[in-house]
Amino acid sequence: MGQKGCPIGFRTGVTKKWRSLWYGNKQEFGKFLIEDVKIREHLRKKPSCQGAAGFVVRRMSGKIEVTIQTARPGLVIGKKGAEVDLLKEELRKLTGKEVWVEIAEIKRPELNAKLVADNIARQIERRVSFRRAMKKAMQSVMEAGAIGVKIQVSGRLAGAEIARSEWYKNGRVPLHTLRADIDYATASAETTYGIIGVKVWINLGEKTSTANASAGSAVSTAQ
């Protein structure tokens, strides 16, 4: 059933790292989970975080560390770190705890599914042909070194009366193979005809069990 499930959740702990790194007992777990959701929702609404691909939340001795993964770190940091300081203060008021904000730069945005999906969605909002946007994105992904890529758009494409889905695929995207490092993300474009959904799958290659073990140990010792 690899075709039906989320590729990220399907591979978490195998080739994908957890996006929330903390432990909570029965009394704390629900509270921590709600805090994580509020933090992510707040960051997604910030203009400085519009180009962010993801957020990792860590907790340690009453403090929260949020790592923002972005291809444009300068936009998140702001002039002389003003934006980061503002984020820290807003998150401190939101959670009532001390919050650290770290910035992780994405070196190759063409291989990040979230950034690719957001780029396609923004082009569709600017009335660029969805087929042109999809084909251009696929070309950039493959030229960046991906093994395979699949892109799907759904909705009232080009203003059609009946909603439909169209997809393009290039290379190999084995969703059933757990050792395959598949990056997956969704985005939505708000058009005058309604919402257009965008899904992107990118095959970054295969990871061996040894690589997985070292990746897991790196997470536990990082920062």
UniProtKB/Swiss-Prot annotation:
It holds the Pfam family KH_2. SMART domains: KH. GO terms for molecular function: mRNA binding; rRNA binding; structural constituent of ribosome. Keywords: Ribonucleoprotein, Ribosomal protein, RNA-binding, rRNA-binding. InterPro entries: KH_dom (IPR004087), KH_dom-like_a/b (IPR015946), KH_dom_type_2 (IPR004044), KH_sf_prok-type (IPR009019), Ribosomal_S3_C_sf (IPR036419), Ribosomal_uS3_bac-typ (IPR005704), Ribosomal_uS3_C (IPR001351), Ribosomal_uS3_CS (IPR018280). It comes from the Bacteria. The keyword RNA-binding applies. GO terms for cellular component: cytosolic small ribosomal subunit. GO terms for biological process: translation. Residues 39-117 form the KH type-2 domain. The keyword Ribosomal protein applies. Binds the lower part of the 30S subunit head. Binds mRNA in the 70S ribosome, positioning it for translation. Part of the 30S ribosomal subunit. Forms a tight complex with proteins S10 and S14. Belongs to the universal ribosomal protein uS3 family. This is Small ribosomal subunit protein uS3. The gene is rpsC.
